[in-house]
Amino acid sequence: MSTVVARVYIVRHGETDANRQGIVQGQLDTPLNDAGVEQARLTADALEDTPFEVAYSSDLQRARRTAEIILEKHPGVKLETTPALRERYMGDWQGVSIAGRGVPPENAEPTIDFTARSAKWWNEAVLRHAQRKASELQLKLKFAQAQNGHANARNGSAVNGLASAEPHTEPDVELEFEPVHILAVSHGGLIGTLVTNLLRSRKLRAGEGVVIWRCFNASISVVDLYEDGKGVLVSYADTTHLNVVDMVQENADVARG
């Protein structure tokens, strides 16, 4: 059975006034409102015991501040902000009410470019850490086999960036190994686009009972990446940690034209 080498927690930023008012934000740099700050704190409580090693966020303040609040409980973890995790640029729609919209404006970021941007970040950031941990796992296995003389312990892999496609048997040696835990704080449109693209390209499969639907403010999605290069969407847009009943139901930044 393949081993999890990376666990990714993808969080949408907390609520903003524009979210509440149904205004398209796109790449406008809007702050969290009071409800958004509280949502971020509840998310921080939910993730307090998660041993994060790496943290990324969009450089827009609503995502960055959400990440900073979460990381207050993880003081040793450095936050890396990046424009790659920004929401889709919505052109003339930015700052406009969701009501009465039609086809996205011509100066909006093309869907193909938006999808490629999110995929590029995933490949260069997340998979890099997964590859590193897969290599670490293989070294530990080889060392354990050499130390204990288990010639028939499972054969490693590091293919597709992660592990080799050769089948292997379960090791009969115990290893001290923990996957890398990664935090990524972004926006509803980007999270939905990233996850949908990974599923369609079969880089991920949805876990049992997992449904892709609205990505609520401060929701948590979890992805497990295995040493064989495969991934599982463990949960999507989970809000069970939030005690805020009156959540914004519609994301104005997700184009439906």
What are the residue ranges of the model-derived segments?
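Internal catalytic-core helix/loop-beta-alpha segment
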Residues: 106-169
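Glycine-rich N-terminal loop/short-helix segment of MobA-like nucleotidyltransferase
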Residues: 15-29
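Phosphate-coordination/substrate-recognition cap region in phosphate-metabolizing enzymes
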Residues: 41-108, 124
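Acidic, low-complexity terminal tails and accessory targeting/binding regions
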Residues: 2-6, 91-97, 147-180, 196-257
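Short, conserved phosphate/pyrophosphate- and ester-handling motifs at nucleotide-, phospho-/glycolipid
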Residues: 13, 36, 187
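Generic beta-sheet signal
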Residues: 8, 180-189
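Short catalytic helix/loop segments, enriched in acidic residues and glycine
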Residues: 26-42
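Short beta-strand scaffold positions
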Residues: 57-58, 116, 185-186
